[in-house]
C-alpha cells in the first residue's frame, strides 16, 4: 500500500494503547536505531504521526516503576544494567528526536502506566527539538482511553484527527 502513489503518508497515524502505545512511539523512532542493534532494520517504515494512549515510553523507567509485574525484564531479557543496549534500542524516549508528530493521551489517575511515562517523553522530545502534544485527562485511568462510551473517547478521537489535518 505504501508504494501506491495515491497513498498519502502524511494522513496516516500509528496508534496504540499501553504496550501498543509503546510500539507506536517506538516505530516512529525506529529509524534512529543504530545499525549494530538487532532491532535495526534497513526496511523501516516511515512514520509521520504517532498517537500513544497511556503508552510506555521509557523501558528503563518502566523497569524502575516495576510496571506489569516484571514484564519489562522478560521483554528485554534482563535488567537495564544487564542489557543497556536493548533498553536504549527498545525505549522510544531513547530514540528522540524522531521528526514525527506525536500526541500522547494519558489519564491523570492511570495506575497501570503512570502519566510520568508520557510526561518524561514530552519533556525530552521538546528539549531535543520535537514538538509533541500531551493530552492529560483528569479523573481518567488506563482503560477509559479505549472505551468508546467513556468521557475520554472524544479526546482520543480529537488526538487522532489533530494529526490528520
Segments (PLM) and residue ranges:
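Primarily recognizes the serine-hydrolase "nucleophile elbow" in alpha/beta-hydrolase
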Residues: 1-65
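Short, proline-enriched alpha-helix->beta-strand connector loops that line the catalytic pocket
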Residues: 44-48, 97-102, 128
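Histidine-centered divalent metal-coordination motifs
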Residues: 17, 106, 142
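Mobile cap/lid helix-loop segments that gate and shape the active-site cleft of serine hydrolases
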Residues: 61-94
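Short beta-strand/loop motif that positions the catalytic acidic residue
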Residues: 104-106, 110
Amino acid at each position: 500500500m505504501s508504494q501506491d502513489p495515491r497513498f498519502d503518508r502524511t494522513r496516516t497515524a500509528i496508534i496504540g494503547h499501553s504496550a501498543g502505545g509503546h510500539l507506536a512511539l517506538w516505530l516512529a523512532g525506529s529509524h534512529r536505531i543504530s545499525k549494530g542493534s538487532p532491532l535495526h532494520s534497513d526496511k523501516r517504515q516511515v512514520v509521520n504521526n504517532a498517537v500513544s494512549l497511556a503508552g510506555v515510553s521509557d523501558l528503563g523507567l518502566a523497569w524502575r516503576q516495576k510496571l506489569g509485574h516484571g514484564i519489562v525484564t522478560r521483554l528485554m531479557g534482563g535488567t537495564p544494567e544487564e542489557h543497556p543496549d536493548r533498553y536504549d534500542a527498545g525505549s522510544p524516549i531513547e530514540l528522540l528526536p524522531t521528526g514525527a508528530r506525536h500526541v500522547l493521551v494519558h489519564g491523570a489517575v492511570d495506575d497501570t502506566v503512570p502519566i510520568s511515562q508520557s510526561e518524561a517523553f514530552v519533556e525530552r522530545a521538546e528539549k531535543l527539538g520535537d514538538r509533541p502534544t500531551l493530552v492529560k485527562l483528569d479523573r481518567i485511568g488506563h482503560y477509559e482511553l479505549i472505551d468508546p462510551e467513556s468521557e475520554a473517547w472524544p479526546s482520543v478521537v480529537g488526538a487522532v484527527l489533530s494529526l490528520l489535518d
